[in-house]
């Protein structure tokens, strides 16, 4: 049926008016019509689109709701990792952050920072192509998140189409999804009346709402989105400053939190912090601190990143909320590396909306310094508003029979000896990979993606294998039989075959991956590559003295001692030999010959045709180079694949050498 021109014009007019009212309500906080009038406009548009379905477009305001439930969330790879921020908890830490930046930039005078509230919600990435929302993804582990596009489309403050026409060809807008306090209280009241599950706090409510498999449920939750950062950007140059990015957001219809302020120097940041400490309760949603960012994007690019956080930003957390309760018992947990940690079992108490019944005492030095005993009345707080910890006892309330806790002489799990080296705060079980507590975590680590990458061997299955005594040590992974696996609940023939295929595939690995998989304390994937590159053979590494290990660049005395102790423990040596006997193998690491890659730092952006990102990084490391995830002035080359991200733009701005895949492969052969 042909749509009359008059009707088409009215539909377009209604869409424009509704989008404009959304913009005024969510971005400008200046609504110009009552809700009832807005509802009338929306219902009129719905009726017209129902009568003329050929007029419906994906970006129409009516298309926020109505998608069918999903079976599972698809994974999304973040081209630019969604990194978290480092935290500081006092003025001293904040001043140290400022000092590090100025020293790195060789600046004496203060420079501009942008201060903003640290929203206590869920990080979200919005991808817009030619102004239209095409994908929304959660942070996940920072590298891989979940596709929550259908759910995000139901959030009224997220524009399905950016305003105006001055937006780039492709832009990734990062921000936070929140549930305002008022909406949270109302939701819990109504859920309680229905006898449904309630949420402990607004953050849990926002996270649970965003990850509903049925978008129609998300649509009923009072969620709001605020943008705070650009990830990918194509078809437009970055502006000069971060505050200019926020102005872009407002122009495009992306809500930006109003309490953002540009300040001169660290003193301005401290003033902003003090102001927000006093006014945080007046805000419509929960915040747990402030975020401080260098305003200049050029300076941000120069500073770059360290590990999993940017150097140019920091989170200054508010003092944690505190409550009193009683210590019922002090028990001991054993971690993957054998650390024996005292944990207080508490009379349950609500702190910041979360019921706390366990709290860490960190280590035995902390336990004795605080002098916490069973029976004590203690102050409990959520450190950084997240992790429960015991601040200390109230001595005036201490009962006469309060018991002082001693370091256990034996591991509570495997009964091996527990030792506490002089000068160290942590006591450790020496049972190694034979300790059941360490075994559970060690298998999870051993089979993880960056280690031997055994697909399908998840946490629950590991627990089940240990519980059923199918795996008694880490070598048991390679001795699993199909008949034993299929006898387990919910494990059919196909599942068993897939798992055994993945286990067999994992036998062929690399020396760096194998070293990382062993879970040696202090040996991450970077240190594992360093060790493999230096020794080339496992036997040489296992025989190395502490002095030899300390001669290697980036291996300090503590790491050297841990590596030496691990390989000189009889149980571990036997386990390694057994793994090799069971077929775990790798190509011998070749000594690095002089090449154009040796000593150079590389960053990859975009997809390569002939190699995965991990394969390319491994080849760089084997050739004596270094692969990093972010561009800085210390980067030598940026390898540009298909559909490069903003790393490409940053590299151009810093004058860093750009090479394509063909040039990179030639360098590898050099």
Swiss-Prot record:
GO terms for cellular component: cytosol. Zn(2+) binds at residues 411, 414, 429, 435. The keyword Mitochondrion does not apply. Its EC number is 6.5.1.2. The keyword Manganese applies. NAD(+) binds at residues 35-39, 84-85, 116, 139, 176, 293, 317. It catalyses: NAD(+) + (deoxyribonucleotide)n-3'-hydroxyl + 5'-phospho-(deoxyribonucleotide)m = (deoxyribonucleotide)n+m + AMP + beta-nicotinamide D-nucleotide. GO terms for biological process: DNA repair; DNA replication. Pfam families: BRCT, DNA_ligase_aden, DNA_ligase_OB, DNA_ligase_ZBD, HHH_2, HHH_5, Nlig-Ia. GO terms for molecular function: DNA binding; DNA ligase (NAD+) activity; metal ion binding. PROSITE patterns: BRCT, DNA_LIGASE_N1, DNA_LIGASE_N2. Disulfide bonds: none annotated. Gene3D superfamilies: 5' to 3' exonuclease, C-terminal subdomain, 6.20.10.30, BRCT domain, DNA ligase/mRNA capping enzyme, Helix hairpin bin, Nucleic acid-binding proteins. The active site is at residue 118. SMART domains: BRCT, HhH1, LIGANc. Keywords: DNA damage, DNA repair, DNA replication, Ligase, Magnesium, Manganese, Metal-binding, NAD, Zinc. Its cofactor is Mg(2+); Mn(2+). DNA ligase that catalyzes the formation of phosphodiester linkages between 5'-phosphoryl and 3'-hydroxyl groups in double-stranded DNA using NAD as a coenzyme and as the energy source for the reaction. It is essential for DNA replication and repair of damaged DNA. Belongs to the NAD-dependent DNA ligase family. LigA subfamily. This is DNA ligase. It comes from Coxiella burnetii (strain RSA 331 / Henzerling II).
């Amino acid at each position: 049926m042909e749509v009359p021109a008059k009707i088409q014009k009215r539909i377009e007019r209604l869409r424009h008016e509704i989008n404009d009212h959304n913009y005024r309500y969510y971005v400008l906080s200046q609504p110009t019509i009552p809700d009832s009038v807005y509802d009338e406009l929306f219902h009129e548009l719905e009726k017209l689109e129902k009568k003329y379905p050929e007029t419906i477009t994906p970006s129409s305001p009516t298309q926020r709701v109505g998608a069918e439930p999903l079976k599972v969330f698809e994974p999304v790879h973040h081209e630019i990792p969604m990194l978290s921020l480092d935290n500081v908890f006092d003025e001293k830490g904040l001043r140290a952050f400022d000092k590090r930046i100025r020293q790195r930039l060789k600046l004496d005078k203060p420079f501009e920072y942008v201060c903003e509230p640290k929203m206590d919600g869920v990080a979200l990435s919005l991808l817009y192509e030619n102004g239209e929302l095409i994908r929304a993804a959660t942070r996940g582990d920072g590298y891989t998140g979940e596709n929550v596009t259908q759910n995000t489309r139901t959030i009224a403050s997220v524009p399905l189409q950016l305003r105006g026409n001055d937006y780039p060809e492709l832009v990734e807008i990062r921000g936070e999804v929140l549930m305002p306090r008022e909406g949270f209280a109302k939701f819990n009241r109504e859920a309680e009346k229905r006898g449904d599950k309630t949420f402990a706090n607004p953050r849990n409510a926002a996270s649970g709402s965003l990850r509903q498999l049925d978008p129609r449920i998300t649509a009923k939750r009072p969620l709001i989105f605020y943008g705070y950062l650009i990830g990918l950007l194509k078809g437009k140059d970055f502006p000069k400053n971060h505050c200019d990015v926020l102005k872009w957001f407002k122009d495009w219809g992306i809500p930006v939190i109003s309490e953002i302020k540009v300040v001169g120097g660290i003193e301005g940041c401290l003033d902003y912090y003090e102001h927000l400490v006093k006014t945080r309760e007046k805000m419509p949603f929960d915040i747990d601190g402030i975020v401080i960012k260098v305003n200049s994007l050029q300076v941000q690019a120069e500073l770059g990143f360290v590990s999993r956080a940017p150097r140019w930003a920091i989170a200054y957390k508010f003092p944690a909320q505190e409550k009193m309760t009683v210590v019922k018992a002090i028990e001991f947990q054993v971690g993957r590396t054998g650390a024996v940690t005292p944990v207080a079992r508490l009379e349950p108490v609500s702190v910041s909306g979360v019921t706390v019944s366990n709290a860490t005492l960190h280590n035995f030095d902390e336990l004795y310094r605080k002098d916490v005993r069973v029976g004590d009345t203690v102050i409990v707080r959520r450190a950084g508003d997240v992790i429960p910890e015991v601040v200390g006892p109230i001595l005036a309330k201490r009962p006469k029979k309060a018991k002082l806790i001693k370091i256990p002489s034996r591991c509570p799990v495997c009964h091996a000896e527990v030792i506490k080296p002089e000068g160290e705060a942590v006591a450790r079980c020496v049972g190694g990979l034979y300790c059941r507590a360490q075994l559970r975590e060690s298998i999870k680590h051993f089979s993880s993606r960056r280690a031997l990458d055994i697909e399908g061997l998840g946490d629950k299955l590991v627990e089940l294998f240990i519980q059923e005594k199918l795996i008694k040590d880490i070598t048991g992974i390679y001795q699993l039989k199909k008949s034993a696996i299929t006898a387990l609940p919910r494990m059919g023939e196909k599942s068993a075959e897939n798992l055994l295929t993945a286990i067999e595939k994992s036998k062929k690995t690399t020396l760096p991956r194998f070293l990382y998989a062993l879970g040696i304390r202090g040996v991450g994937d970077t240190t594992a590559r360093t060790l493999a590159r230096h020794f080339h053979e496992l036997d040489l590494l296992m025989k190395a003295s502490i002095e030899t290990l300390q001669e290697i660049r980036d291996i300090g005395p503590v790491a050297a001692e841990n590596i030496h102790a691990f390989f000189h423990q009889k149980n571990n040596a036997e386990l390694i030999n057994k793994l090799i006997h069971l077929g775990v193998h790798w190509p011998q690491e070749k000594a690095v010959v002089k090449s154009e890659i040796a000593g150079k730092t590389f960053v990859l952006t975009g997809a390569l045709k002939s190699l995965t990102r991990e394969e390319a990084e491994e080849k760089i490391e084997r050739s004596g180079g270094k692969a990093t995830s972010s561009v800085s002035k210390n980067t030598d080359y940026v390898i540009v694949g298909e559909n490069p991200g903003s790393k490409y733009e940053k590299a151009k701005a810093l004058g860093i050498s750009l090479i394509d895949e063909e040039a990179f492969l030639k360098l590898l052969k050099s």
